[in-house]
């Protein structure tokens, strides 16, 4: 039985999804959940890319105790040095170095010859090997690279000290047959194939990321890279939950085992969906809302008689609990904290106290507090505590058929209160115009989404927004409240605050 390692890049490649920006606290929360999930390697970020990313990688390296943490680096000594510094507190640090090997990338992006690329690989892998015990090399755009040159580049990296070779399908170009053949070619040509770890990193542009990853495993790969829910730039990445469950359900075929704790997938998926603002499609394999629903009468009858008739995956396998009991206003701290742990949250003692206080307030307003309410409660607490701006007062003047007005008062992190007013063709526009005046930013709203957290008239509203600033950068915000307008204001204020903070950091870097 072969052992397959799981390499999660939700915090690096997943964050490249337009509009997804995790702050440090959110990244640590995700990393801790990935650790509970049994992920072998967490790619925490790209340390050289920005001071913020460096600090995130550093914080995650310090927080994670039971799996490896890695950082991305180009074939540049400064990148490698920065990664080493960020990962110095990691229990098991690794580094992930990449350089393109396809002709189109070498000619138009790198402006390097094949000989120069090989020389760079040799030098920088050797340099990194002096600092890291585990060095992973990725020949970017491998699936569009000349096969003979790709093999030469891989051999060069191994000879220089690479311990892991990752084969990226960077633009989602290949198919399972071709990708499997590529690994067969590598096995045939690379003399050390069985002595090091080969991995795959697939994108989903043609909808074949999971199938390609499984084809790689069939043909010798012992590490799979991907993200939770398959998030990532463009069409996304290999969805790790799909690969893990496929290996488990079809163990007879793949003859593979993993360290993954399968019943933590639902918690992981929910957490990342809420923090990223990307809802999981209801028909998504493994963790979608309809994954275990049966509409057909014939199917329903069969499942009732024997679930094996139409269910190859049980909900409990991935942590979907259909019998979760709601909490209420009489529930105590022990029951509340136990439920938090079951849902995958790791809270400090103070965070537990704050969360329980908010829970009691929520329980007074609702007859039953469901798991969805609890996710929203923790998410709201986490996001609001990290914000530089807090909504203190909102007043909307509504006239049917007329111009709407809004008055907004916010508190800045230093305690200063500022207030302004503006109008709009609707209540939401009036609120957002007012916040734009307060924040003194040129902001474009690119996405607005509202959903009820639970059913019933006492449901809380959860609003997600994505904005774009004048530099073209996108930021996500979330707001939760019983009042839709208040939730909308909180979401927009949070996204605007992220944009303002990012602009300040960019200005600082430019001056420095």
From Swiss-Prot:
GO biological process, one term: L-leucine biosynthetic process
Cofactor needs: Mn(2+)
Reaction it catalyzes: 3-methyl-2-oxobutanoate + acetyl-CoA + H2O = (2S)-2-isopropylmalate + CoA + H(+)
Keyword Cell membrane: no
UniProtKB keywords: Amino-acid biosynthesis, Branched-chain amino acid biosynthesis, Cytoplasm, Leucine biosynthesis, Manganese, Metal-binding, Transferase
Pathway involvement of the protein, from the record: Amino-acid biosynthesis; L-leucine biosynthesis; L-leucine from 3-methyl-2-oxobutanoate: step 1/4
EC number: 2.3.3.13
Ranges where the Pyruvate carboxyltransferase domain occurs: 4-266
Gene Ontology molecular function: 2-isopropylmalate synthase activity; acetyl-CoA C-acetyltransferase activity; manganese ion binding
InterPro entries assigned to the protein according to its UniProt record, in alphabetical order: 2-IPM_HCS-like (IPR050073), 2-isopropylmalate_synth_dimer (IPR013709), AIPM/Hcit_synth_CS (IPR002034), Aldolase_TIM (IPR013785), LeuA/HCS_post-cat (IPR054691), LeuA_allosteric_dom_sf (IPR036230), LeuA_bact_synth (IPR005671), PYR_CT (IPR000891)
Compartments it resides in: Cytoplasm
KW Cytoplasm (keyword) present: yes
Sites where the protein binds Mn(2+): 13, 201, 203, 237
Annotated stretches, region: Regulatory domain: 390-512
Stored NCBIfam families: leuA_bact (TIGR00973), PRK00915.1-3 (NF002086), PRK00915.1-5 (NF002088)
Function: Catalyzes the condensation of the acetyl group of acetyl-CoA with 3-methyl-2-oxobutanoate (2-ketoisovalerate) to form 3-carboxy-3-hydroxy-4-methylpentanoate (2-isopropylmalate).
PANTHER family xrefs: 2-ISOPROPYLMALATE SYNTHASE 1, CHLOROPLASTIC-RELATED (PTHR10277:SF9), HOMOCITRATE SYNTHASE-RELATED (PTHR10277)
Subunit structure: Homodimer.
Family statement: Belongs to the alpha-IPM synthase/homocitrate synthase family. LeuA type 1 subfamily.
Protein name as catalogued: 2-isopropylmalate synthase
Species of the source: Listeria monocytogenes serovar 1/2a (strain ATCC BAA-679 / EGD-e)
Protein encoded by which gene: leuA
């Amino acid at each position: 039985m072969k052992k397959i390692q799981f390499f999660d890049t939700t915090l690096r490649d997943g964050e490249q999804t337009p509009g997804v920006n995790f702050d440090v606290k959110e990244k640590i929360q995700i990393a801790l959940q990935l650790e509970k999930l049994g992920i072998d390697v967490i790619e925490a970020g790209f340390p050289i890319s920005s001071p913020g990313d460096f600090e995130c990688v550093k914080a995650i390296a310090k927080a994670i105790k039971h799996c490896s943490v890695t950082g991305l680096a180009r074939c540049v000594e400064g990148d490698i040095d920065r990664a080493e510094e960020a990962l110095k507190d990691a229990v098991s640090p690794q580094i992930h170095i990449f350089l393109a090997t396809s002709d189109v990338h070498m000619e138009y992006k790198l402006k390097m010859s094949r000989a120069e690329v090989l020389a760079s690989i040799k030098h920088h892998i050797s340099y990194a090997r002096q600092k890291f015990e585990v060095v992973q090399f990725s020949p970017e755009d491998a699936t569009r690279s000349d096969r003979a040159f790709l093999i030469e580049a891989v051999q060069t990296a191994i000879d220089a000290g690479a311990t892991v070779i990752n084969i990226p399908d960077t633009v989602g170009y290949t198919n399972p047959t071709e990708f499997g053949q590529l690994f067969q070619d590598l096995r045939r040509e690379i003399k050390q194939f069985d002595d090091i770890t080969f991995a795959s990193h697939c994108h989903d542009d043609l909808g074949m990321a999971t199938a390609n990853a499984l084809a790689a495993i069939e043909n010798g790969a012992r590490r799979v890279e991907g993200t939770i829910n398959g998030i990532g730039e463009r069409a996304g990445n290999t969805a790790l939950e799909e690969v893990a469950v496929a290996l488990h359900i079809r163990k007879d075929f793949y003859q593979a085992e993993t360290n993954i704790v399968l019943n933590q997938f639902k918690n992981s998926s929910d957490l990342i969906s809420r923090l990223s603002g990307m809802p999981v499609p209801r028909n998504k394999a493994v963790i979608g809302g309809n994954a275990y629903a049966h509409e057909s009468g014939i199917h329903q009858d069969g499942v009732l008689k024997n679930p094996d008739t139409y269910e190859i995956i049980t909900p409990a396998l991935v942590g979907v609990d259909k019998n979760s009991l709601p909490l209420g206003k009489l529930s105590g701290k022990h029951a509340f904290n136990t439920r938090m742990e079951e849902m995958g949250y790791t809270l400090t003692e103070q965070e537990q106290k704050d969360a329980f206080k908010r829970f009691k307030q929520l329980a007074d307003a609702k007859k039953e507090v469901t798991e969805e309410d609890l996710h929203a409660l923790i998410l709201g607490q986490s996001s609001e505590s990290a914000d530089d701006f807090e909504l203190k007062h909102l007043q909307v003047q509504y006239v049917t058929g007329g111009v709407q007005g809004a008055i907004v008062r916010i508190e800045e992190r230093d305690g200063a209160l500022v207030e302004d007013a503006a109008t709009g063709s609707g209540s939401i526009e009036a609120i957002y115009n007012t916040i734009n005046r307060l924040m003194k930013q040129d902001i474009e709203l690119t996405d607005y989404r509202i959903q009820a957290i639970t059913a019933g008239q006492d449901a809380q509203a959860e609003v997600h927004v994505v904005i774009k600033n004048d530099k073209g950068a996108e930021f996500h915000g979330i707001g939760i409240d019983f009042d839709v307008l208040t939730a909308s204001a909180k979401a927009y204020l949070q996204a605007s605050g992220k944009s303002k903070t990012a602009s300040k950091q960019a200005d600082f870097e430019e001056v420095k």
